[in-house]
Amino acid sequence: MEEPGRPSAAVLIVEDEPLIRMGAVDLIENAGFEVYEAGSADAAIALLELHKEIRLIFTDVDMPGSMDGLKLAHYVRGRWPPVKIIVTSGHVKLTEESLPGGALFLPKPYEPAQITHKVRELLAG
């Protein structure tokens, strides 16, 4: 049962750097969202399969494992089309053409207020 005033959508943070991931999780939780976290694309896919309430993924590009964050974003778009996607990186600048349809790119370092605004905006639309 959802709490009054608490959004019903959950956000999945996918980031291999633990300190950055913890900061992003705190940011999104403080904005009032339920948050799941994964350190790799493989872990993210497992969480998406288990938790149908996940409505947005916020993923870093550079990650170890079978796929990076950009490949994960394309995979999610194909398998779970309604899930909103935000991709971030401090190393590469992605073009709109390289992102899956409807995904946003936010370069690191990002402003906390910018992230919470974009998450709210995407989940409202």
Segments from the language model and where they lie:
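Short loop/helix-cap segments at secondary-structure boundaries that form the rim of catalytic
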Residues: 94-102
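Hydrophobic/aromatic residues positioned on beta-strands within the core alpha/beta folds
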Residues: 88-89
